[in-house]
UniProtKB/Swiss-Prot annotation:
Binding-site residues for Ca(2+) 2, renumbered to this chain: D57, D59, N61, T63, E68
Record-stated family: Belongs to the calmodulin family.
UniProt entry keywords in alphabetical sequence: Acetylation, Calcium, Metal-binding, Methylation, Repeat
Note: This protein has four functional calcium-binding sites.
N6,N6,N6-trimethyllysine, modified sites: K116
Gene Ontology MF annotations: calcium ion binding
N-acetylalanine: residues carrying this PTM: A2
Source species of the chain: Mougeotia scalaris
Positions with a binding annotation for Ca(2+) 1: D21, D23, D25, S27, E32
Name used for this protein in its record: Calmodulin
Record-annotated EF-hand domain positions: 8-43, 44-79, 81-116, 117-149
Length: 149
């Protein structure tokens, strides 16, 4: 995961890590995490801090080291990127920008992509993604469908 980061991103994250790692020992404790979060106006409980550490503490030593921190940041970035990409993709399909992808919208985009689909195939694709059964695909349904791929 972290191997997909640029050198610039790694340098930025190293700086951020140093802000958390108050005593400079190369690891972030729950106490250090709490200090930083409180300085940002958050008020996490000790249990919440422990949960946050445990979530990324790959070696189970109770603290976050830099490689673990990098993995966390890379995961968060990937989530953000894919959400933006999904919004853009949805806009491409939602021709009339009404918040829904109709069979006509779907057919139009697929044809432009060079996909020769029959009306039945288009209807079937819409049906598969159309969770609430209203005959069109809203953003939530689109995200579910894309994430399932």
């Amino acid at each position: 995961m972290a191997d997909q980061l640029t050198e610039e991103q790694i340098a930025e994250f190293k700086e951020a890590f140093s802000l958390f790692d108050k005593d400079g020992d190369g690891s972030i404790t729950t106490k250090e995490l709490g200090t930083v979060m409180r300085s940002l106006g958050q008020n996490p409980t000790e249990a919440e801090l422990q949960d946050m550490i445990n979530e990324v503490d790959a070696d189970g030593n109770g603290t976050i080291d830099f490689p673990e921190f990098l993995n966390l940041m890379a995961r968060k970035m990937k989530d953000t990127d894919s959400e933006e990409e999904l919004k853009e993709a949805f806009k491409v399909f939602d021709k009339d920008q009404n918040g829904y992808i109709s069979a006509a919208d779907w057919r139009h985009v697929m044809t432009n992509l060079g996909e020769k689909l029959t009306d039945e195939e288009v209807d079937e694709m819409i049906r598969e993604a159309d969770v609430d059964g209203d005959g069109q695909v809203n953003y939530e349904e689109f995200v579910k469908m894309m994430m399932a791929k």
